[in-house]
Amino acid sequence: MKGQEARGEEPPSGTVAARRLRRRLDSEARILAAAEQIFAETGFSGATTAMIAAKARLPKANVHYYFRTKRQLYQAVLQRILEAWLASGDGIRAEADPATAFTDYISAKMEASRRQPYASKVFANEILHCAPEVDDYLRDQVHRWVQDKARVIDRWVAEGRMRPVDAPHLFFVLWAATQTYADFDCQMRAVLRRRRLAPGDYAAGAALIIRMVLGACGIRTGNGADRRRVTQGAERRG
């Protein structure tokens, strides 16, 4: 059974190994969720594993069993949100419909801001400090991800399915527009005079961002219309 876990295979349901795996995954999830909130509220320097254990309602020894150091736990929080953000763009493929691909990506990024606001804030704080823990990840995985998606967008442009855009800067805009609903939610709550943002706020924000992006990129929707060639004249009218 240990060999199965090491290979990433799930043991048969109901076995001792399966129950052990479920407990491990549950404990790790609780620790990571607690760590997201503590790191977001206190920063890396202000956080302690004792605070995280208390938030997770687990013994401190359990935290150190799964994550040997506070830094390792902090890196795990950052890696988890970064991997989720990159995975949300899996639909941006050459054979995909541009309107659907961007709609799904923006919706997924906004949902991440709604469901994991603390993780987003941890990342934002990391970036404000020049990304000491994720600089290599940004220069490697994120760089390659952006270059891969840029090639897809360039192909869509060449096929006349959207207007020419600077793809990396398009993603910078999308990241800022969606992540602000997590990173600066207190600003929005104050302006809207609400204790917390409602699901409708995220939906309204996503809908607006989608309309703006599709419009600016000259992507038509419905009945394959987005595949029609975007002419220079249409670009000037936009």
Q: Regions from the language model: what does each represent?
A:
Residues 75-104, 152-154:
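Amphipathic alpha-helical linker/stalk segments
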Residues 1-15, 108-111, 115, 143, ...:
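C-terminal peripheral helix-coil segments that are non-catalytic and often amphipathic
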Residues 31-39, 109, 213:
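Short hydrophobic clusters on alpha-helical segments that form packing/core surfaces
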Residues 90-121, 159, 167-174, 203-206:
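Hydrophobic alpha-helical connector segments
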Residues 122-126, 140, 173, 177:
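Short acidic/histidine-centered micro-motifs embedded in hydrophobic/aromatic stretches
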Residues 27, 70, 77, 81, ...:
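Hydrophobic/aromatic residues within well-ordered alpha-helical segments
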Residues 30, 38-72, 76:
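Helix-turn-helix
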Residues 114-136, 184-193:
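Amphipathic alpha-helical segments used for helix-helix packing
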